[in-house]
């Protein structure tokens, strides 16, 4: 059952009201948003520029990769829940489409507002997708226990706080964070975790639908592979052209490879009977791209990237195995997707790695490239040690914004008119979607199984089973 008639009537009205939200956004775009000089036909040709020099040709390939990651990678990574696949992909689509518009306005007012207008181009598109990524990270922490109206309100608040935090870090404190270990991963993770703590529901610990099935975990691996392949582009998307962008992609590439090996090694070590856990592989193998987010543009060295990636993969795997149960039982945080292990802890490690590498920066190591990586050091306004301290202070600022914002967001999402799904309907697609009338679940052990062969539930054939329609 999808719920009572009154609840169904409320849902019928909630999402159509999005047209008013889209209309308000469109009005703000009409008043404030304009093409920048690299996009406007008259301004570009007035400068007698060659089309080959347009920023589009340098940034758009990275934008394509980032865009695919946000809409395909994040969405499919969350389809592991056995009865929440439509919602995982569909609400990712909805949230990202709204967040990229709203963040264009928020970031525009903070970063590119001059002459009374916000000026947009391919860089603003990438920045908007970055912000949408942070929102989707937070979504992962509350996946399955929030409705679309609640999620949109979460995005409305989080995008504003994301923009303010980013402005404080990058423009006021002069923090360097090319791949977003601080601004994207740490902020998004702890915003979502505090939000989840405020929305804690003790009865959900008993839900049988919080786990994956063979086919749902397989689909989630599609998201993992998408993110794994394209993450060097994500970290390098807005770094300085030339050596900086090249170095960022290289460091991310090696860190991802090392985190994957670390994940496989630790998963087998801590797994039952030495077997791999697909949850570890889906998630912890990606921790390498988070841990080098801050330092990927710096002279981390290939060895440093490998070491950092391996450490992140092992820490993330151990987090899924040991810390997630503690997080729920002791701290009342129901972290559905394990964002603390994939984004939170690796994000903090990434910030600390950035502190170390920034503190070791010298003119000899960077040469003329110091200006593009650490402009304040190159100009003599800061020492390397001072830059490192600002990097560390940026972590505390981020945690403050994330914690306060997540707490406030949790209180807002508890408002009764937002139609939070009841405990019995959490992690269920049919609450918000016209789901098919049958689902897939594992069969009992087949009669032809070899006697004495170790039984593996994940490898059982699949059968069609009538959907559980009880409220």
Curated annotation (Swiss-Prot):
Record-level GO cellular component terms: basolateral plasma membrane; spectrin-associated cytoskeleton
Gene assigned in the entry: RHBG
Protein name (Swiss-Prot/TrEMBL): Ammonium transporter Rh type B
Purpose of the protein: Ammonium transporter involved in the maintenance of acid-base homeostasis. Transports ammonium and its related derivative methylammonium across the basolateral plasma membrane of epithelial cells likely contributing to renal transepithelial ammonia transport and ammonia metabolism. May transport either NH4(+) or NH3 ammonia species predominantly mediating an electrogenic NH4(+) transport. May act as a CO2 channel providing for renal acid secretion.
Similarity remark: Belongs to the ammonium transporter (TC 2.A.49) family. Rh subfamily.
PTM info: N-glycosylated.
Keywords: Ammonia transport, Cell membrane, Glycoprotein, Membrane, Transmembrane, Transmembrane helix, Transport
Main subcellular location: membrane
Bias-annotated ranges (Basic and acidic residues): 452-471
Residue numbers on the Extracellular membrane side: 34-60, 107-123, 170-177, 239-249, 302, 366-391
Subcellular location: Cell membrane; Basolateral cell membrane
Glycosylated sites: 48
């Amino acid at each position: 059952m999808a719920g009572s008639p009154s609840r169904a009537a409320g849902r019928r009205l909630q999402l159509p009201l999005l047209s008013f939200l889209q209309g308000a956004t469109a009005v703000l775009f009409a008043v404030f948003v304009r093409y920048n000089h690299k996009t406007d036909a008259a301004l570009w040709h007035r400068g007698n520029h060659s089309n080959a020099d347009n920023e589009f040709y340098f940034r758009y390939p990275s934008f394509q990769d980032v865009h695919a990651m946000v809409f395909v990678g994040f969405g499919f990574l969350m389809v592991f829940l056995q009865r929440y696949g439509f919602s995982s992909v569909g609400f990712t689509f909805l949230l990202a489409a709204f967040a990229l518009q709203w963040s264009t306005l928020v970031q525009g007012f903070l970063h590119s507002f001059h002459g009374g207008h916000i000026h947009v181009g391919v860089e603003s598109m990438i920045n908007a997708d970055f912000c949408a990524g942070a929102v989707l990270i937070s979504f992962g922490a509350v996946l399955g226990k929030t409705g679309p109206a609640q999620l949109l309100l979460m995005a409305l608040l989080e995008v504003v706080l994301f923009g303010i935090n980013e402005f404080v870090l990058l423009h006021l404190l002069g923090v360097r964070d090319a791949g977003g270990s601080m601004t994207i991963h740490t902020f998004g993770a702890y915003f979502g975790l505090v939000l989840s703590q405020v929305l804690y529901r003790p009865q959900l610990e008993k839900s049988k639908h919080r786990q994956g099935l063979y086919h749902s975990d397989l689909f989630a691996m599609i998201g993992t592979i998408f993110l794994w392949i394209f993450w060097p582009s994500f970290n390098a998307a807005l770094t300085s052209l030339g050596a900086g962008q090249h170095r960022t992609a290289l460091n991310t590439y090696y860190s991802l490879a090392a985190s994957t090996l670390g994940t496989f090694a630790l998963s087998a070590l801590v797994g039952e009977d030495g077997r791999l856990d697909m949850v570890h592989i889906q998630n912890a193998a990606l921790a390498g791209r988070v841990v080098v987010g801050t330092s990927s543009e710096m002279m981390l060295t290939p060895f440093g990237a490998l070491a950092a990636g391996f450490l992140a993969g092992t820490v993330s795997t151990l987090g899924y195995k040991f810390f997630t149960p503690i997080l729920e039982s002791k701290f009342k945080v129901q972290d559905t997707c394990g964002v603390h292990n994939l984004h939170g802890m690796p994000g903090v490690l990434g910030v600390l790695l950035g502190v170390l590498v920034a503190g070791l920066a010298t003119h000899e190591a960077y040469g003329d490239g110091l200006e593009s990586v650490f402009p304040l050091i190159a100009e003599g306004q800061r020492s390397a040690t001072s830059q490192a301290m600002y990097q560390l202070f940026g972590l505390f600022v981020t945690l403050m914004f994330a914690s306060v914002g997540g707490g406030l967001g949790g209180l807002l999402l508890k408002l009764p008119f937002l139609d939070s799904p009841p405990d019995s309907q959490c992690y269920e697609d049919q609450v918000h979607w016209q789901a098919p009338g049958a689902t897939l679940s594992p069969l009992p052990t087949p009669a032809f199984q070899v006697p004495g062969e170790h039984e593996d539930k994940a490898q059982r054939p699949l059968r069609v089973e009538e959907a559980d329609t009880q409220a």
